[in-house]
Amino acid sequence: MANMEKTNAQFEQALSECRALFEKKLHDYKASWRILRPTALTDQLFIKAKRIRSLEIKKESLVGEGIRPEFIALINYGIVGLIQLSEGFADTVDMDNQEAMRLYDHFAQQALELMKRKNHDYDEAWRSMRVSSYTDFILTKIERIKEIENLGGDTLVSEGIDANYMDIINYAVFGVIKLTE
C-alpha cells in the first residue's frame, strides 16, 4: 500500500507540473487549441509520441529537447483532447482561460482517479515496465483513435476515444515519473 501512496503523490506532482506549464501557455496563446478538429489533435499526439520513439531509438536530439518534455506535452494534449470531446471544436477561441483551467482540472482529476483504480488492480505493474513500452502503448492508443475516427466513432466492442486519451495521459505520466526518478 505504501507504494501506491507513493505513486499517487508522484502522479499528482507530475500533473501539477503539467498544469503549471499549461496555464503559462494558456496565458501566452489563450485557448488557441479550441480550433483543433479531432483528427488534427490526434496527429499532434502522434507527432509527440513519434518523436519520443525516435529519440529512444537514435539516442540523440538535434533540437535539444529531450523525451520528458514530450511526455508532458502528451499529457496536456491528452487533456485538451478530452476537453475537445466534451465541448466540440470551435472556429475561433471561444473559451476564456478560467473555463479552460476548470475543464483541465476536471479531466486531470478523472485521469488521476482512473490511475488509482487501475493501479490497484494491476498492483504497480507500471513500475516494472520500460519507458519505451509506455511510448509503444501510447502509439498503439493513437492508432486506435485514428481507426475509431475513420469509423466515425462507430465501434462494435472497443472503448471510445475518451478512454484512449485517458490511457495516453496515464502512460505519459508514468513516463514523466520514471524520467524524474
Label the predicted regions.
Residues 1-181:
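Intrinsically disordered, low-complexity regulatory regions
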